[in-house]
Amino acid sequence: DLRMSRGLGDVYKRQILSHDHFQGGHYEFAMAKAPIEKKWVFPGFEDVDAGIVHWPMSCIRLICADDERLVELADQILTAWRGYTDESCFVYAETDGEPHNTITPIARMRDGKFQLDLVLRNNLTTPEHPLGVYHPHAKLHHIKKENIGLIEVMGLAVLPSRLKQELFDLADLLVARAPTAGYPEALQKHAEWAQDILDRHPELNADNVHLILQDEVGHVFAEVLADAGVYKMDTAGRAGFVRFLESVK
């Protein structure tokens, strides 16, 4: 069912395609360290090293000493992606006249060459996923419900401030092995997750609970990035990614 949901979902749909800003800084994010898992040669751009980055969000990396060639190829990829549909991967360029595809670009200089990471984005929504098919899904909203921006795309979790106190309170309940049914209302959204943590960490105690929670939040954030990735890191997803690359002319 490709009927677009309304309300809050519309806010997120508009944001991903119209939220324009430039952000700079001197910090090496995890995505910048991720290797290329599959090299690719774009016809007519044999001088540009390219490939699929080993990252949960769908990222194409371009490397070239000539920045103009890099921009020329990036523009070609963006144009192709804006008009690209692959129903087998649930990728639609538009529905009901509304466009869905865009790119988040990240540029850096490394070893005397320009690098440009192009992260494929799609803001399609459905009744099942009213905030976005490629957005954190409902089971993760107790940790992260907000939109996935540039910083998160590169691997640094920007989490809601409410979590700071909630995780401290949750730590006390975990150490006490308190029944999840008795959790206060503000922590009920974490109950299922908390029980799963206890089941997998019988060693949890007052000394290690905060480290365990930090690690578990990290695992949730990895799932957030996986949800936001258009092409999943499995055989079908990577095959779909290659089909798109083949379409870039």
Describe each model-derived feature in a short phrase.
Residues 1-8, 12:
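Single conserved hydrophobic/aromatic residue that forms the stacking wall/gate
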Residues 3, 109-111:
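Extended, composition-driven regions rather than compact fold-specific motifs
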Residues 10-18, 95-102:
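Beta-rich nucleic-acid/ligand-interaction surfaces
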Residues 13-29, 119:
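Histidine-centered divalent-metal-coordination microenvironment in nucleic-acid enzymes
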Residues 25-48:
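Helical (often loop-to-helix) elements that flank the catalytic cores of nucleotide-handling enzymes
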Residues 51-87:
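A conserved active-site cap/scaffold subdomain adjacent to cofactor or substrate pockets
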Residues 74-106:
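Active-site/ligand-binding surface loops and adjacent short beta/alpha elements
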Residues 112-249:
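Sequence termini and other peripheral, non-core segments
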